[in-house]
Amino acid sequence: MELSEIKKRLVRYGELKPCKTAFIDAHTPGSNQKENFTIIGSGVSESADQHVHINIPHGFNIGAAGQPPKCRNSLHSHRTAEVFFVLSGRWRFFWG
């Protein structure tokens, strides 16, 4: 693979562009500080403003989210797996 092709598939952490209107709940108090990142693939964003970092077809999506303390994520469901990795801070997960 040529270096130019590799660069098309490289996203540096410092270059991630967040979307603060990715989902309908981003407009509600308590959820309005979330940042959504679509890293590989189009993801599940509901916003035309969402920046897709790597839009080359892969057959999967990788995204990320950032939220300050006490910021809520509304209950929702997926037909695919959703996996959480905590990179920093303290998180509490609840569902049901």
Language-model features, listed with the residues they occupy:
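Conserved short histidine dyad/triad with adjacent acidic residue
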Residues: 43-49, 61-78
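A short, N-terminal "cap"/entry segment at the start of jelly-roll beta-barrel domains
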Residues: 1-59
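A short beta-strand-loop-beta hairpin characteristic of the jelly-roll/cupin
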Residues: 77-96
